[in-house]
């Protein structure tokens, strides 16, 4: 029984599915997808649960969410292993994901009060009050790269605001989704407040097509995000929050501290085997001897990176990609760029055929035309050389995406220029592109999102503002508007 609907675990009636470890092929999870009728049933359960949940005092909702945080802490080792085995990422990195899930609770509570709490301004004849109200029933679509943390960033603020939810994890990480939902069940969520539907494209389409949804919160690829945007066009009554990918530039202007610059680049491009939406995809390196030396050192150090199993000892820096198919897609993208005229600096290699273990690849594309403006979700770094900083910014902005951008330089003025001219939601200076703070908004512009950033700003799309002018008494104004006559006439 792999679906959780209205507080009950039930068996899916859709397609049979199984999940294996992307390196060992060990079967980790088996179950059936939710069919369209079960998706509709989950929505009905969420709708029925909404009035009571929305009317619960905030303190009651907070108590359940904090109980969930305590359960995450108590079961950290178990959830870490589930995430690591299912995604292929090393145990150390999966542990940081669970820590981020735990930290998200306190941050979301603070964000709720800071961004969507109640504010009152006293007036001469009453008060002006700003309150926030939940949307109702929301669908949450989760990605596979951070199958615990990223859905958590939607689910927690949505529940705190008083919404009820239908959660569809990625079909590539059903085990993590199920494990997390079982902790929510133990936290004491009332039946119907949070529902789990497993499945792939058909389940997702059934969910996003429901007329009774009040909104949809999505983290994933730009292609799927665009499909959802088209599907919900003409429905302004529904909130739609899209957190999509990026073709992110990292500018290396000054690499005098060579190894520090190389370390920052490795963290930006290859952590999580390149499967972070903020990963550097385009490396812009200044022309000259220093840039040449930097690239040589980068290729040297990156060439020593050996991906390994989730439980290897010692732990590797990177593990496997989500699937062998994903690794093959990266290889095909590299070959395509070679065919366009790219010069390979570091050849990506499959460690073992049939697995998702893939070494990093680096290819220079200076002067190459018709390079696809796409997010290759894996350890492939494209290099361009530039002559002056204005050219670097032009290259950085030469993309339909706009998620993250970074600069390695000692010149504050260059960073200030980048802040003014970069088209990206995250702009970092001498910090990895993959570094982000939950106390700041997380999101981008262009093909990277629809101006609904998450993290600290997730509270914004989980509730709508209600403005009130209020007074306990009804009084006639001392001064009336022109043309109004309230004088009493004597009866004739």
UniProtKB/Swiss-Prot annotation:
Its EC number is 1.2.1.71. Gene3D superfamilies: Aldehyde Dehydrogenase, Chain A, domain 1, Aldehyde Dehydrogenase, Chain A, domain 2. GO terms for molecular function: succinylglutamate-semialdehyde dehydrogenase activity. Catalyzes the NAD-dependent reduction of succinylglutamate semialdehyde into succinylglutamate. One of its GO terms (biological process) is arginine catabolic process to glutamate. The active site is at 243, 277. HAMAP family: Aldedh_AstD (MF_01174). This is N-succinylglutamate 5-semialdehyde dehydrogenase. Belongs to the aldehyde dehydrogenase family. AstD subfamily. It comes from Salmonella schwarzengrund (strain CVM19633). Pathway: Amino-acid degradation; L-arginine degradation via AST pathway; L-glutamate and succinate from L-arginine: step 4/5. NAD(+) binds at residues 220-225. It catalyses: N-succinyl-L-glutamate 5-semialdehyde + NAD(+) + H2O = N-succinyl-L-glutamate + NADH + 2 H(+). The lineage of its organism: Bacteria, Pseudomonadati, Pseudomonadota, Gammaproteobacteria, Enterobacterales. Keywords: Arginine metabolism, NAD, Oxidoreductase. It comes from the Bacteria.
């Amino acid at each position: 029984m792999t679906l959780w609907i209205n507080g009950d675990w039930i068996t899916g009636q859709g397609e049979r599915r199984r999940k294996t470890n992307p390196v060992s092929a060990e079967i980790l999870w088996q179950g059936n997808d939710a069919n369209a009728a079960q998706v509709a049933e989950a929505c009905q359960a969420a709708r029925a649960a909404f009035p009571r949940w929305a009317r619960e005092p905030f303190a009651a909702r907070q108590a359940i969410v904090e109980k969930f945080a305590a359960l995450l802490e108590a079961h950290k080792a178990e959830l870490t292993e589930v995430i690591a085995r299912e995604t292929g990422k090393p145990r150390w990195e999966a542990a940081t994901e669970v820590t981020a899930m735990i930290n998200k609770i306190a941050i979301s509570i603070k964000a709720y009060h800071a961004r969507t709490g109640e504010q009152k301004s006293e007036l001469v004849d009453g008060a002006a009050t700003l309150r926030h109200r939940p949307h109702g029933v929301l669908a949450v679509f989760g990605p596979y790269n951070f199958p615990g943390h990223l859905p958590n960033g939607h689910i927690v603020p949505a529940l705190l605001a008083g919404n009820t939810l239908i959660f569809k994890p990625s079909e590539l990480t059903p085990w993590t989704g199920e494990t997390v939902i079982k902790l929510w069940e133990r936290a004491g969520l009332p039946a119907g407040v949070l529902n789990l539907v497993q499945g792939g494209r058909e389940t997702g389409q059934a969910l996003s097509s429901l007329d009774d949804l009040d909104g949809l919160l999505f983290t994933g690829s730009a292609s799927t995000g665009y499909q959802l945007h088209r599907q919900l066009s003409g429905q302004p009554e529904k909130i739609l929050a899209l957190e999509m990918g990026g073709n992110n530039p990292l500018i290396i202007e000054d690499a005098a501290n060579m190894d520090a610059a190389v370390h920052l680049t490795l963290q930006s491009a290859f952590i999580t085997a390149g499967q972070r939406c903020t990963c550097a995809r385009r490396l812009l390196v200044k022309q000259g001897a220093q840039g040449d030396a930097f690239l040589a050192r980068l290729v040297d150090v990156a060439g020593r990176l050996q991906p390994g199993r989730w439980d290897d000892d010692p732990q590797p820096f990177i593990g496997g990609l989500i699937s062998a198919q994903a690794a093959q897609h990266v290889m095909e993208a590299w070959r395509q760029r070679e065919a366009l005229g790219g010069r390979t600096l570091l050849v990506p290699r499959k460690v073992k055929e049939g697995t998702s273990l893939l070494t990093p690849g680096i290819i220079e594309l200076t002067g190459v035309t018709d390079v696809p403006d796409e997010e290759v979700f894996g350890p492939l770094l494209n290099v361009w050389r530039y002559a002056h900083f204005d050219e670097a910014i032009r290259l950085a902005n030469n993309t339909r995406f706009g998620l993250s951008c970074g600069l390695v330089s000692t010149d504050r003025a260059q960073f200030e220029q980048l802040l003014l001219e970069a088209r990206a939601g995250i702009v970092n200076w001498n910090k990895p592109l993959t570094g982000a703070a939950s106390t700041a908004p997380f999101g981008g512009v262009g093909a990277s999102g629809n101006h609904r950033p998450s993290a600290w700003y997730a509270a914004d799309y989980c509730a709508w503002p209600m403005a009130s002018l209020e007074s306990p008494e009804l009084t006639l104004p001392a001064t009336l508007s022109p043309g109004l006559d309230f004088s009493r006439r004597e009866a004739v």
